[in-house]
Amino acid sequence: MRFIEEFINKGYFHQCTDLDRLTAITKETKIAAYIGFDCTATSLHIGSLMQIMILRLLQQHGHKPIVIIGGGTSKIGDPTWKDEVRKILSKEDIAKNAEGIKKSLSKFIKFGDGKSDAIMLDNAEWLDSFNYLDFLRDFGSYFSVNRMLTMDSVKLRLEREQHLSFLEFNYMLLQAYDFYYLSKHYNCSLQLGGSDQWGNIVMGADLIRKISGKEVFGMTTPLLTTSSGAKMGKTAAGAVWLNEDLLSPYDYYQYWRNCEDADIVRFAKLYSEFTQEELNRFEILAAEDINAAKKQLAYELTKLCHSEQAAKSALETAVKIFEEGQIDENLPTVVLEQEVLQAGISAYELFHEAGLATSKSEARKLIRGNGAKINDRLVEDENMIINTNFLLDKNVIKLSAGKKRHILVRV
């Protein structure tokens, strides 16, 4: 199966500047294509997983993935579909986040010097050296403000009478220049992104056409939500991160294990590497035994992101907790100072400190709603003092928030 054919078959396709021509070119030759990521966190989360799988698919078909880390544009912030001005990051934060993002991506694609090896570039390399007057002189005449004002991402903010700074308004010019720079210096002929990036992508393709006459393409993916309308990558407990220092492989496994029934076949198609035959069998399994299908999906996706050993460990932990009622040391663990436990800590504070509630008020609400357990016993008093008497074997206390979220507190 060819790249574009598989791209469409897996459900990645939304829009393309010239699909027929791009299909023909990718059949005849290998191309370089890029996707950009802002440096807004020390890890990517599953909201970026489709884009990551596309980079992986490109590489598997012999094309060259280019990853752009927006060290330059992150200093401004993308206004696309954002209701508010984004916080501007320091150079130190951007560098730290870029390192974490490369760690996320390295789980899925190979970086190196080979023909199809991925490369990672920071657009600060070329944007930081910009002279503003030179940029206006050399590129300003190619951009139409009339057209920029009609783009949905800008129009939305204006219609709501929300602040859109000149700083953010320049973002689309810089992203267009990124595409031009990559086309000129890396022979990049395709930019990929979410459907919310369509306007920015088209502006870049137009800039290249006007300046150099090169044939380049833009292609977008649909914006994904769960079947209930929730945004991919976010849960009540926070983001579903790809890096294990922010989210344990067990919690990653549990996210997919607990996804909505209506989503599992679609997620298998988007995020797994099942062959068509395996996918057909998976669809049959999902119709006959939804829980078995969810376990298989969670296992496969955890293996892909972390390792087969991590997937096995997560599965074994889940079996011990949910099917055998045991405590497993592979559960996510937080460390509490022994002095704190000796002095005693209220139940609601402990749930907050352990990360099972984002605030103390949320922890109180969890307990009042009968959703909190300590050592598998319901917590009825939010002010109950938890001390060393609650320690189980191996000096741990098991905390549970609802039926699915568990954590060990270790001293």
UniProtKB/Swiss-Prot annotation:
The keyword Ligase applies. PROSITE patterns: S4. One of its GO terms (biological process) is tyrosyl-tRNA aminoacylation. The keyword DNA repair does not apply. A motif ('HIGH' region) lies at residues 39-48. ATP binds at K234. It catalyses: tRNA(Tyr) + L-tyrosine + ATP = L-tyrosyl-tRNA(Tyr) + AMP + diphosphate + H(+). Gene3D superfamilies: HUPs, RNA-binding S4 domain, Tyrosyl-Transfer RNA Synthetase. Its EC number is 6.1.1.1. GO terms for cellular component: cytosol. Catalyzes the attachment of tyrosine to tRNA(Tyr) in a two-step reaction: tyrosine is first activated by ATP to form Tyr-AMP and then transferred to the acceptor end of tRNA(Tyr). NCBIfam families: tyrS (TIGR00234). Belongs to the class-I aminoacyl-tRNA synthetase family. TyrS type 1 subfamily. This is Tyrosine--tRNA ligase.
